[in-house]
């Protein structure tokens, strides 16, 4: 694979921390110009400042269609176009079936599912016109298994992301636009290392055949692989990133 990309623009949602921030770094290192979007972007702007004007940060709430349109319009004004869209923004609702309120259910769907649809809807027209595009959706191990804990709203929303991935892939393949998804499990984010107890981490590690959590850099480079121009014959794929925890 050719290492350096020239003159391509990538949009990353949920870019201010964790998997999104790691993805921004990997794309910048590969040569992309990157539009990083999130509810607030101070951290990504600070940590990626060395990349200068190849990075631009925009406030965008993926559950708000007006903000999606405004941010994408600003990105296109600054960079000219959007070639790659990484739908990473997400919300994890810690509630079982009986604990899930209508408000929590709808919030989860607005961010995790509606956000993927409406961001993609906004950017895919330009990709189609130019005859090239890469859409990478972040689903979840839980979408395929129900998850290790009872999180029905989250699992259902991410299952919807996988279905959207299949639908987009079929609709836009003839126009040079691919759409694929990642289904990660136990990526070593701050949430995992700080909010999951040491005892629970030990229990989880026993379930993962490779015996460790996924590094952020490993996650980001899987995104980079699916976003690359040389990955044009891969579409409608869900790439499992789970250390052998589950096989199709």
Model segments located where?
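Conserved glycine-rich cofactor-binding loop
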Residues: 16-17
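Substrate-binding pocket helix/loop in short-chain dehydrogenase/reductase
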Residues: 96-97, 104-106, 192, 204
């Amino acid at each position: 694979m050719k290492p350096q990309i020239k003159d391509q623009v990538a949009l990353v949602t949920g870019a201010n921390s964790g998997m999104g921030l790691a993805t921004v770094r990997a794309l910048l290192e590969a040569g992309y110009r990157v539009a990083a979007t999130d509810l607030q972007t101070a951290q990504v702007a600070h940590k990626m400042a060395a990349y200068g004007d190849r990075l631009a940060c925009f406030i965008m709430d993926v559950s708000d269609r007006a903000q999606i349109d405004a941010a994408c319009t600003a990105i296109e004004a600054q960079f000219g176009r959007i070639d790659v869209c990484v739908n990473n923004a997400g919300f994890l609702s810690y509630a079982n079936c009986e604990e899930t309120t209508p408000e929590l259910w709808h919030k989860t769907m607005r961010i995790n599912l509606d956000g993927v649809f409406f961001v993609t809807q906004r950017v895919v027209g330009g990709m189609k016109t130019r005859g090239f595009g890469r859409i990478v959706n972040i689903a979840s191990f839980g979408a395929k298994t129900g998850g290790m804990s009872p999180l029905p709203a989250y699992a259902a929303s991410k299952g919807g992301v996988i279905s959207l991935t299949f639908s987009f892939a079929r609709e836009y393949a003839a126009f040079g636009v691919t759409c694929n998804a990642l289904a990660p499990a136990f990526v070593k984010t701050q949430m995992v290392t700080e909010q999951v107890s040491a005892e629970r981490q030990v229990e989880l590690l026993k379930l993962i055949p490779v015996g460790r959590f996924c590094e952020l850099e490993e996650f980001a480079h899987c995104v980079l692989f699916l976003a690359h121009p040389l990955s044009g014959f891969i579409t409608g794929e869900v790439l499992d990133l789970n250390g052998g925890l589950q096989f199709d």
